[in-house]
A protein has these predicted regions:
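Short, well-structured N-terminal submotif of metal-dependent ribonuclease cores
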Residues: 1-36, 49-62, 139-140
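Acidic active-site catalytic centers that drive phospho-/nucleotidyl reactions
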Residues: 5, 43, 98, 117
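Alpha-helix/helix-capping structural signal
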Residues: 7-8, 39, 77, 119
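Short, hinge-like loop/turn segments at secondary-structure boundaries
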Residues: 52-55, 90, 129-133
């Protein structure tokens, strides 16, 4: 499964996004399923509602229901690790959505991600030392 960040979803669903064409072209070539987290889902819905129009967020939610991506469940046990990550990367700063994706990489055992946020995801490490591999690196 490919981990998907907020920027990827925004570029895919918002035709006015600067990365829409590149992300859309990349998206149609992929055969692997996507996975994301509830903090990312929340962030995407909020931004689609404010950047596009209120019902655009429902398109995103319906896409999940149609099987476009899986949703990783964050438990209470994960909150300590996410807060530790946010402290470690406070200088960027790391938000809850990003912390949830680094945690997801640790849970999946790989750091393959799609994100338009190249700076932060180039800096973050899963398992404290493993770099994330942004599959959009050569596309954007």
């Amino acid at each position: 499964m490919i981990i998907a960040d907020t920027g990827f979803w925004l570029a895919l669903f918002d035709r006015r996004d600067n990365h829409h064409q590149a992300v859309r072209a990349f998206f149609v070539t992929l055969k692997e399923p996507f996975i994301t987290t509830l903090p990312v889902l929340t962030e995407v819905c909020y931004l689609l509602q404010t950047r596009c129009y209120p019902l655009k967020a429902t398109d995103f939610l319906m896409a999940q229901q149609a099987g476009l991506f899986h949703l990783f469940t964050i438990s209470e046990d994960h909150l300590l690790k996410m807060s530790q990550l946010m402290i470690e990367y406070a200088d960027l700063p790391m938000d809850l959505a990003d912390a949830s994706l680094v945690l997801l990489a640790e849970e999946l055992g790989h750091g393959r991600i799609v994100s338009t946020d190249r700076r932060d995801f180039h800096t973050y490490r899963w398992k404290n030392s493993e770099p994330l591999s942004n599959l959009l690196e050569g596309v954007l």
